[in-house]
Amino acid sequence: MTMKALVIASLALLSSCSVSAAETDLIKQGEYLARAGDCVACHTAKGGKPFAGGLPMETPIGVIYSTNITPDKTGLGDYSFEDFDKAVRHGVVKNGSTLYPAMPYPSYARVSDSDMQALYAYFMKGVEPVAQANKDSDIPWPLSMRWPLAAWRWMFAPTVEEHPAQVAADPVISRGAYLVEGLGHCGACHTPRALTMQEKALSAADGAAFLSGSAPLEGWIAKSLRGDHKDGLGSWSEEQLVQFLKTGRSDRSAVFGGMSDVVVHSMQYMSQDDLTAIARYLKSLPAVDPKDQPHQYDKQVADALWKGDDSKPGASVYIDNCAACHRTDGHGYTRVFPALAGNPVLQTADATSLINIVLNGGTLPATHTAPSTFTMPAFAWRLSDQEVADVVSFVRGSWGNKGAPVTASDVADLRKSDMRTTSGDDLGQVTQKH
């Protein structure tokens, strides 16, 4: 081989290695972004293979099933980048059908072109193909017809050009806005929806409805993430928020419901810089209630319980079933059993989540940085509807909390609801598995 040929061959080899390394980096970036978007949580059925779809999702008109997004021909195998982009950011699949808005493409419209390229590289070259056909929805005809979804998309979903990332004076807040309003699609759960099921706001610029809390879905409500002290994040520090997102627990609260999946599949893998950006952005959101005030601890109930006075409705149920972990003063045990005093979850206008936890229990998920799990047992088998209502009302109105009381009929409605039949033990197993 001549020297000239050797040089040419060496340059070609170096070029090949460079392309391969660049592609590997792009796939790795796409994997991180897929984590940020928590794609696996919706596109993986219980006991199924990652991203193969088939997870049932309750909607007001029936059950739909998530789709296969692996690079198999039954999934994304024949999707070009343009096809992929049209589905993710525009809500239109390869055959021209509009996706159900359970796919948060109105939020994904904010994802940048470069991040879309990385996501495509990951799903096409970094995900194991799984041959699994998509399942049809259980929505009855004529509600199952897709053409109304196209009209919905036209009326309510922003175009990519109309929905650019917000830019703030603080670049950390700008990054947080991009993650929360875009890939993180936090508003899909934490923003209320109109009768026509669109989110009432897609960004902070759209008004105070953004991230102000949702209506009940599958037995839970997604609480407000705005600056209110009573039922939002006003009393949380930036550091506490980062800790909560990374571990599922903090000095102030513990994760439950669908947010457990978010922590397990997504948030624990985010970089410290990105978690800080998310927390700082959320802390920048003002309160909804201009008269909102910080929680003022009231020790009257704690003193009464300490003296053995359980005359207040719900007090005896609390002493017998709750005080050992959450204490008579309502302060709980840091990062083990959450405090009830001043806890925003106890003071939301809708007590569905709290009733659900009492009935069905729950388990803190294990994460890389907080591997220990703690379980609250289910009390549905032990307490009557009236006893649950009494103890829920008791904790919502004690230690300075300002939550309204609930009734036995509120408990009965949730108990017999077919949306949440999982026992406390089953919930723990599901959470652990994911």
Cite the ranges covered by each PLM segment:
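Bacterial N-terminal signal peptides that target proteins for export
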Residues: 1-7
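Bacterial N-terminal signal peptides
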Residues: 8-16
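Sec/Tat signal peptide C-region and signal peptidase I cleavage site
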Residues: 17-22
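C-type cytochrome heme c attachment motif
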Residues: 32-44, 67, 83-90, 101, ...
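The feature marks the first
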Residues: 38-44, 55-110, 114-115, 219-249, ...
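C-terminal soluble interaction/assembly domains
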Residues: 347-348, 372
